[in-house]
């Protein structure tokens, strides 16, 4: 399970100073772990971020969805805070329960991680075929199918390497796979993607420390 010691201690400290505090969580926390935090305070709102590291400010302001998970009355207060005091373009906020917000966040991140690996393997096929068109044309054409979208198809990725790395996808994929296992469920596709990614990334001598 995730180590929530810092989150728990910070939450308790805030409640000690102000018992009626509304606590907004931005960190990516698996649903089962959030259940434990509810025992500390019912005034929790989970407001997950959907940011690319390279474009964090831009993505925050232009996020296609802003989710508030938790008690509806409390969540609406946080929503009003956004509406009154932020430059976020999206005004159509989404309200869910706490655990649903976490499930949505992890589903998106791990799907995109799996998508990265899928297109890494399609690139392997591309490189073995005697084709005249470029990889860029291939993925650009595939992306015209709106069901697939155009993101996370570049091989290599934005870091110049194959597979997925950085601060989010590796840790989120492992955490969600472990969460599923603890719940008696199996994320076989994600588990296979993690295994393939580990094999791909192992060829690089230097990696972001956050991947280890």
Question: What are these language model-derived features?
Answer:
Residues 1-212:
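Structural/interface elements that position substrates and couple domains in central-metabolism enzymes
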């Amino acid at each position: 399970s995730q180590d929530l010691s810092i989150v728990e201690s910070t939450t308790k400290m805030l409640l000690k100073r102000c018992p009626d505090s509304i606590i907004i969580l931005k960190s990516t926390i698996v649903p089962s772990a959030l259940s434990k935090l509810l025992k500390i305070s019912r005034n929790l709102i989970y407001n997950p971020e959907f940011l690319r590291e390279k474009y964090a400010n831009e993505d925050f302001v232009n996020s296609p969805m802003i989710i508030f998970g938790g008690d509806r009355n409390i969540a609406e207060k946080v929503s009003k805070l956004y509406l009154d005091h932020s430059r976020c373009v999206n005004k159509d906020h989404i309200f869910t329960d706490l655990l649903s917000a976490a499930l949505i966040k992890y589903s998106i991140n791990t799907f995109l991680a799996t998508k990265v690996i899928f297109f890494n393997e399609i690139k392997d096929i591309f490189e073995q075929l005697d084709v005249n068109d470029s990889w860029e044309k291939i993925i650009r054409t595939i992306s015209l199918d709106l069901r697939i979208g155009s993101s996370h198809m570049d091989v290599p990725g934005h870091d110049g390497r194959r597979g997925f790395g950085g601060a989010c996808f590796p840790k989120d994929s492992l955490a969600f796979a472990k969460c599923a296992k603890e719940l008696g469920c199996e994320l076989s596709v994600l588990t296979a993607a993690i295994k393939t990614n580990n094999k791909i990334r192992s060829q690089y001598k230097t990696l972001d420390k956050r991947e280890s």
